[in-house]
Amino acid sequence: MASTSSTSTDGHLNIRPMVHGSDKKLNFGAYITGLDLNNASDAEVDQLREAILRHKIVVIKGQQAEKPDKNWEMIKKLDPMHHMITQEEFGQLFHPTGEGLIAMLKLATVPTTEHGHIHLMGKGYQGDDHYGLKKLNLGEAFAGNYYSKPLAEEDFRAGVTRFQSWHMDGPLYKVHPPYISSLRFIQLPDGEQTVEWADGSGLSLKTKPGRTAFFSTSQLYDMLTDEERAMVDNSAVEYMYYPYEWIRGCRGNPNGLNVADEGREKPLDAMEEIARDERWTKTYPMVWFNELTKEKSLQVQPNCVRRLLIRRSADQKEPEIIEGPERVREFMNKLQQRIVRPEYVYVGPEEEGDHVFWYNWGMMHSKIDYPIAYGPRIVHQGWIPSHRVPRGPTAVAH
């Protein structure tokens, strides 16, 4: 739904849709003031959930004093159908023994009473005592070599950067993706960077460092042709089991969309050796409904897809099967590439103390790396899997 410049107050919440510049065509986002996340009432939680589904992403201002326990409590309340898991189970969503991606990332967990999944997504020194984490320095890993077209370190130091990887939160195996996701921005670096697409398009975008990029998958759906909408409405995707283990050796495309076709996936015979339960492999509609607004979103994370089940219309009984990483990614790139442009991308938030919640079933987001010379980044990330099953025009989700 398009944002306007009007201001509305729902109960105690002041909800102000974002007003984007004349160079922007994106149609989502809102700011919220008048909400204390440490003391939110049940009515305010309900209003916040509705605002997130309606505006896709909300930035709650002035949350410098928010407590990690209250952060985790809010994440659970925003999805009453959440799926509780332990920290050990969290790692096992990505690899049966907790190895692989999660072990490689070495995520620091912010202590909470319930051992919630509030992870420290920062850079540099996190302080002498950050909620019980003592003198933690997250260092500076340079991600330039992750791309199939590497980013030169001297360019990176000079302020050039890239989108890292467009994705929705969740493992895409065993459990359903989180309904709503959370980033609390505690400390942010200063300066300016230029995100370069580096894909031959010549596109670029000025940003502040340490922020996160977002685009709307409902806006993407609206950009499709009638023929394309008829196809995606009736099609589905099957994700690889433990998909992040499958693509762990892959390099990313320089614009952050998908991974490069270089044959670097873990071989299928090696994947077959990984213990798994076929019941946990996820097949979802390409298009997901927003239960509040009834909007449709083209909600596909292409780098993790094993095969596509394509029906051009509701009358087509048997799907056309598209499989093989190169064919799948080429097909999805043609559908998704059009939204990855500066005018459709929001990068935020603006300042420290902002807490961002977004509708994970209707957005894609990407980290943007920066040099530590700009200063430390202290951010709390949180999400919880959902028992909700994504629904769309094609009822295939499991």
UniProtKB/Swiss-Prot annotation:
Coiled coil: none annotated. Pfam families: TauD. The keyword Zinc-finger does not apply. Pathway: Mycotoxin biosynthesis. Binds 1 Fe(2+) ion per subunit. Its EC number is 1.14.11.-. This is Alpha-ketoglutarate-dependent dioxygenase bsc9. It comes from Alternaria brassicicola.
